[in-house]
């Protein structure tokens, strides 16, 4: 469950290490984002020489959340951290690698490129 001012780890190789959520996309009064939702964020921490630098405003898709999410079969999925992948305007990832597992909900939301790059889909 990601909301404004939430800080997320970046799970790709764009050069950003941490982002801060500015806005949850999908309606004027939408408060929370879960796995597979798109947010607008600013880069808070980045490595030198990366594709993005500190202060850049980017779009990202949430791939892991600490808050558990109920699946249609009755099971729950939750992760140890909140993480996101920075995306381009056409919803493809900006980086070329994805680190760590991602939620299966990304497949339903049609983020196939992220699914194919991820080492594990839970």
UniProtKB/Swiss-Prot annotation:
For whether the record's keyword set contains Ribonucleoprotein, the answer is yes
Recorded hits in Gene3D superfamilies, A to Z, give: Ribosomal protein L14
* InterPro entries, alphabetized: Ribosomal_uL14 (IPR000218), Ribosomal_uL14_bac-type (IPR005745), Ribosomal_uL14_CS (IPR019972), Ribosomal_uL14_sf (IPR036853)
Xref: Pfam families: Ribosomal_L14
One Gene Ontology term of the molecular function aspect? structural constituent of ribosome
What's a GO biological-process term for it?
A: translation
- Whether Lipid metabolism counts among this entry's keywords is no
Q: Name one GO cellular component term.
A: cytosolic large ribosomal subunit
What keywords appear on the UniProt entry?
Ribonucleoprotein, Ribosomal protein, RNA-binding, rRNA-binding
- Family named by the database record: Belongs to the universal ribosomal protein uL14 family.
Q: How does it assemble?
A: Part of the 50S ribosomal subunit. Forms a cluster with proteins L3 and L19. In the 70S ribosome, L14 and L19 interact and together make contacts with the 16S rRNA in bridges B5 and B8.
Q: Which PANTHER family match?
A: 50S/60S RIBOSOMAL PROTEIN L14/L23, LARGE RIBOSOMAL SUBUNIT PROTEIN UL14M
- What is this protein's function per UniProt? Binds to 23S rRNA. Forms part of two intersubunit bridges in the 70S ribosome.
Protein name, UniProt field: Large ribosomal subunit protein uL14
Q: Which organism is it from?
A: Mycobacterium marinum (strain ATCC BAA-535 / M)
């Amino acid at each position: 469950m990601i909301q404004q001012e939430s800080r997320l780890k970046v799970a790709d190789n764009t050069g950003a290490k941490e982002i801060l959520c500015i806005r949850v996309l999908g309606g004027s009064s939408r408060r929370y984002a879960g796995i597979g939702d798109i947010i607008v964020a600013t880069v808070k921490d980045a490595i030198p020489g990366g594709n993005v630098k500190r202060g850049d405003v980017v779009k990202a898709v949430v791939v892991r959340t600490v808050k558990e999410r109920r699946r249609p079969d009755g099971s729950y999925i939750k992760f140890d951290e909140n993480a996101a992948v920075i995306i381009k305007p056409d919803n493809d990832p900006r980086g070329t690698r994805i680190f760590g597992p991602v939620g299966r909900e990304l497949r339903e939301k049609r983020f196939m490129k992220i699914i194919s790059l991820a080492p594990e889909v839970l």
